[in-house]
């Protein structure tokens, strides 16, 4: 019984109806606390262990951990504020929230933080001390009031809040300045609001975050473990003006909630800078001119541009005067301009490069997921593994080794310089039984990675992995066989079914011919006198014969055993470059094997498409506007080059067209003959019906479209793009309400990354567990890779029922 059983026990307990006491704890799986003051007790369940922590009278129990294998309970006086957390199997650590919190609720009667100075800066006297003041309240007289050390407390329920006796003989006591918890109120824009309000400003009931009804959305709690998306409580996961929620009214997708502002000062946002560090959210300099030289509009002004980025709506962002700021998480400080024709622009802020930057500041907290589809493996205990897998056995993303969020740790590149602790890749720096990582889920400290152990014949990735290529299925095997009609056959059979030797393709005796020669068909493999199928004959490979009385005859080439290729699993590892189609990355050949080139009958590429089964291609309906006739189109499969097609490509006519009946921008093409599934031609997987891709999920687009003069034109290109929740995409400054529920947005709001003309109809695929799933069909956009204008894609999951019905009935 290992880690998974700890998880199972925890889930069973939380769902048992008796788990309410655990609401007062923060739990972390796979974490153990180094404790000096502790008790080891037997306990049959987590519930029993929690009860022992509550009942203990020898010391104040601030945390407990439960070991599932031994059914052992350890209650402890320490927590993460006073001790260190280490990684351990088969254990769940529970820490009381009240002792972790440094804020107060109400008058702070239950405050158990560690503030030990008054609001006037005087150090507090210890509660157990009698000097300089003899206390009325002490640990002996009030043992249940948490009178520890010299921490501020409120043992007498004073309406003014926590206080303490002071070390100043002239001042007996003074009040402490304790921050209000964001349970009954909010600081700033409520990004950390943790309360239970679940109605909107107009009184509508909130929809639960883990529900997709009545409104489908991308804020899935399991994908955003640090956003505290509990039940149907108002939250602010996307830098809105204040907490909000999706509503239970089908006619109102979302609305802001009416959360009062806290009366105490907000928490510190960290150091501020007069230069640009990161995205400049803490920039507090005085630059007030944009990159184009426009003067900034005052944040408090509404002319010439009306807006809601006001000092009142963003009280913690220092929107002073007309200085450039970044209140909403854009890529750099910006401002509205005084030019009525230019709503806003970024500002040119000098960089802080000369100042020291910590490793933690530079490290991304959740880098893009890079789990290989062509799964690599590890030898032994995996200490030598240097692959790029970055997901755990349960599908969680790995935390960067150089980051301390959400888990603080000592396994850093500096402390383990030879362990290959790069990015967030799975590693084994401490000789565990296999590669592992800290996770981006605050409640799960670490997990083993989703990697297999190498068999005796497999090679582990011990350096940055090269392109992984399987043998070309058209390469002659020992059996010298063919796929489909054998158009791609390149074997060395050279006799017909009757045993007659074949005539050389370059020869003109005994039979003269001019159509099928190495010169006229350079891509058909017309070598020597080998059997070939240059014209795609349904009878299979053939040749001109050496019998003067027989012009040609077929060859006896057996079919190859059908290869077993699962949907969504390319046999060449994709590059997964964070570049862009416009100015972006050339893909590894055949790493996106479902990519289709939709062409005119004359062979001109004009749209993309996606192979979803051997006989069916999905594309955009607007790609078929020029002609309703299937004969006007054909598809190319297995290509990397737009022109000068490779020998192995498959060219198939289209037999039928199916447009989505409600005129959405999606269409199905039925092929005249099934595609041959090879290592270069593999369908993408369809999503579950009505599945919603989580906000900020990293997905990929591919195509041969317009590259605006950048390198790699004519080769298949790829780009990695984050999905943007429709709620954000429909904001005024982005696509202003144009995106429908049957569509999704993806792109970098800073611009420079997008699909362009010629990519229409092509795939947007997202990696899930161990395969790529087709989530979008490239549909439309405002321009090409423009700032604040992400691309729009048809949401495939909304049409899966229609797609499957058409394929089943035709």
Curated annotation (Swiss-Prot):
The active site is at 622 (charge relay system), 665 (charge relay system), 760 (charge relay system). Residues 20-98 form the PAN domain. It is found in: Secreted. GO terms for biological process: biological process involved in interaction with symbiont; blood coagulation; extracellular matrix disassembly; fibrinolysis; labyrinthine layer blood vessel development; mononuclear cell migration; muscle cell cellular homeostasis; myoblast differentiation. Converted into plasmin by plasminogen activators, both plasminogen and its activator being bound to fibrin. Activated with catalytic amounts of streptokinase. Plasmin activity inhibited by SERPINE2. Present in plasma and many other extracellular fluids. It is synthesized in the liver. Keywords: Blood coagulation, Cleavage on pair of basic residues, Disease variant, Disulfide bond, Fibrinolysis, Glycoprotein, Hemostasis, Hydrolase, Kringle, Phosphoprotein, Protease, Repeat, Secreted, Serine protease, Signal, Thrombophilia, Tissue remodeling, Zymogen. Residues 103-181, 184-262, 275-352, 377-454, 481-560 form the Kringle domain. Changing residue 374 to F: In PLGD; Nagoya-1. N-linked glycan contains N-acetyllactosamine and sialic acid. O-linked glycans consist of Gal-GalNAc disaccharide modified with up to 2 sialic acid residues (microheterogeneity). GO terms for cellular component: blood microparticle; cell surface; collagen-containing extracellular matrix; external side of plasma membrane; extracellular exosome; extracellular region; extracellular space; glutamatergic synapse. It catalyses: Preferential cleavage: Lys-|-Xaa > Arg-|-Xaa, higher selectivity than trypsin. Converts fibrin into soluble products. L-lysine binds at residues 136, 158, 172, 432, 445. The record marks 78-79, 466-467, 580-581 as: Cleavage. Residues 126-145, 396-416 are annotated as: Disordered. Residues 1-19 form the signal peptide. Interacts (both mature PLG and the angiostatin peptide) with CSPG4 and AMOT. Interacts (via the Kringle domains) with HRG; the interaction tethers PLG to the cell surface and enhances its activation. Interacts (via Kringle 4 domain) with ADA; the interaction stimulates PLG activation when in complex with DPP4. Angiostatin: Interacts with ATP5F1A; the interaction inhibits most of the angiogenic effects of angiostatin. Interacts (plasmin) with iripin-8, a serine protease inhibitor from Ixodes ricinus saliva. Plasmin is inactivated by alpha-2-antiplasmin immediately after dissociation from the clot. It is linked to Plasminogen deficiency: A disorder characterized by decreased serum plasminogen activity. Two forms of the disorder are distinguished: type 1 deficiency is additionally characterized by decreased plasminogen antigen levels and clinical symptoms, whereas type 2 deficiency, also known as dysplasminogenemia, is characterized by normal, or slightly reduced antigen levels, and absence of clinical manifestations. Plasminogen deficiency type 1 results in markedly impaired extracellular fibrinolysis and chronic mucosal pseudomembranous lesions due to subepithelial fibrin deposition and inflammation. Angioedema, hereditary, 4: A form of angioedema, a disorder characterized by episodic local swelling involving subcutaneous or submucous tissue of the upper respiratory and gastrointestinal tracts, face, extremities, and genitalia. HAE4 is an autosomal dominant form with incomplete penetrance, variable expressivity, and female predominance. This is Plasminogen. The lineage of its organism: Eukaryota, Metazoa, Chordata, Craniata, Vertebrata. The gene is PLG.
